[in-house]
């Protein structure tokens, strides 16, 4: 029996939990040609929501076409163009009218076209004579799509990667080309919320105030509990209410970790799940991650490691400069605490959640947090 608790981005709407409000908001934005920036902490389900949105669009608005491109692996404008072109080719199959037009256009770039041995997906290699030719190719791709007189949604995942490109003008270049299109709608998302926020909220940057923001929080306890119970029951298995409550509390309703724990519980094969079975799965997950967690210890200073433990033992900390927190964990001064928190946020080990009451810090990896609590 296939495990219904998906730990990759998206499989089907039946195996996707809630997000109905966010889905409808994004759908309205797409229909009305409103570009969006999706902001949330890591592993909360941004990519899954985008793919769920595309699934919905294919059903209710089949005249709208969708393209998804993940640029996490990109290092420069060359890689960006390559990944975008490959994503476009994947979206528009060669035997369709638009696909044939696309292939004719791609050939004008004089590419070396190969196919992945495993997936069969097209892979491009494009040789450029000058930086100007790269810019011309990027603009040409967007102009080609825009000229088809059909509505196309382009989702760019890990968009903050453009900040690491050696081409200092990449943001300005993209913004200039994108704002001239009429039939393209863009969705930007990324796992580094600080860089994403700076790209879109810094008034000195090209993308400032160019999109609507969609904030992705945690799924409600009620929705997730109903979802978990349904998937177990549909597969002929039982799970009691106390077990579900423990799962949601232990994973802090963080999408990736909730899915991972439920996936592990289901994989263990018990027809009836109680809290003891849930705790067994929790132990398995922490043991599986232990080798990685010990590597973190090697890459951090002693003070940083001890600070990470302190935050884990607290669960979350909203006043990292408070005397009580500093004294309880022998951290030192308030400035030391802030410096350590900033360093660990920069390394991606701490999450700083900004809310109306201030900033709350927690360990990014929920399983790591529970493992650290024991030290």
Residue ranges with predicted function:
Residues 1-41, 56-60, 351:
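A short, basic N-terminal segment
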Residues 40-44, 48-153:
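P-loop NTPase nucleotide-binding core
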Residues 193-211:
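Short regulatory helix/loop adjacent to the ATP-binding pocket of P-loop NTPases
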Residues 212-223:
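Conserved AAA+ ATPase "SRH/arginine-finger" region at the nucleotide-binding site
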Residues 225, 229-292, 302:
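Amphipathic alpha-helical "lid/sensor" segments that cap RecA-like P-loop NTPase cores
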């Amino acid at each position: 029996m296939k495990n219904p608790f998906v730990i990759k981005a998206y499989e089907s709407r039946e195996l996707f939990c809630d997000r109905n409000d966010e889905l409808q908001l994004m759908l309205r934005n797409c229909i009305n040609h409103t570009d969006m920036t999706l902001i949330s902490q890591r592993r909360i389900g941004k990519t899954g929501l985008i793919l769920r949105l595309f699934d919905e669009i294919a059903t209710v608005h089949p005249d709208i076409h969708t393209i998804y491109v993940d640029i996490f692996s990109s290092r420069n404008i060359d890689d960006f163009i390559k990944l975008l072109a490959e994503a476009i080719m994947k979206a528009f199959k060669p035997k369709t009218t638009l696909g044939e037009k696309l292939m004719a256009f791609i050939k004008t770039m004089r590419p070396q076209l190969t196919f992945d041995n495993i997936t069969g997906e097209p892979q491009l290699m494009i040789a450029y004579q000058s930086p100007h030719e790269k810019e011309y190719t990027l603009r040409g791709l967007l102009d080609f799509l825009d000229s088809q007189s059909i509505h196309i949604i382009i989702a760019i995942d890990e968009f903050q990667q453009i900040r690491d490109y050696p081409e200092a003008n990449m943001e300005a270049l993209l913004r200039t080309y994108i704002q001239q299109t009429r039939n393209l709608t863009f969705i930007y998302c990324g796992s580094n919320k600080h860089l994403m926020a700076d790209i879109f909220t810094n008034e000195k940057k090209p993308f400032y105030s160019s999109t609507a923001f969609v904030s992705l929080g945690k799924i409600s306890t009620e929705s997730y509990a109903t979802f978990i119970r349904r998937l177990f029951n549909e597969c002929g298995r039982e799970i009691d209410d106390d077990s579900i409550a423990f799962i949601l509390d232990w994973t802090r309703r963080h999408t990736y970790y909730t899915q991972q724990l439920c996936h592990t519980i289901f994989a263990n094969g018990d027809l009836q799940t109680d809290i003891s079975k849930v705790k067994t799965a929790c132990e398995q997950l922490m043991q599986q991650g232990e080798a990685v967690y010990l590597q973190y210890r090697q890459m951090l200073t002693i003070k940083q490691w001890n600070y990470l433990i302190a935050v884990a033992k607290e669960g979350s900390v909203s006043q990292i400069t408070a005397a009580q927190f500093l004294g309880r964990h022998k951290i030192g001064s308030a400035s030391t605490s802030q410096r350590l928190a900033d360093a660990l946020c920069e390394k991606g080990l701490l999450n700083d959640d900004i809310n109306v009451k201030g900033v709350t810090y927690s360990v990014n990896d929920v399983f790591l947090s529970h493992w650290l609590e024991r030290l």
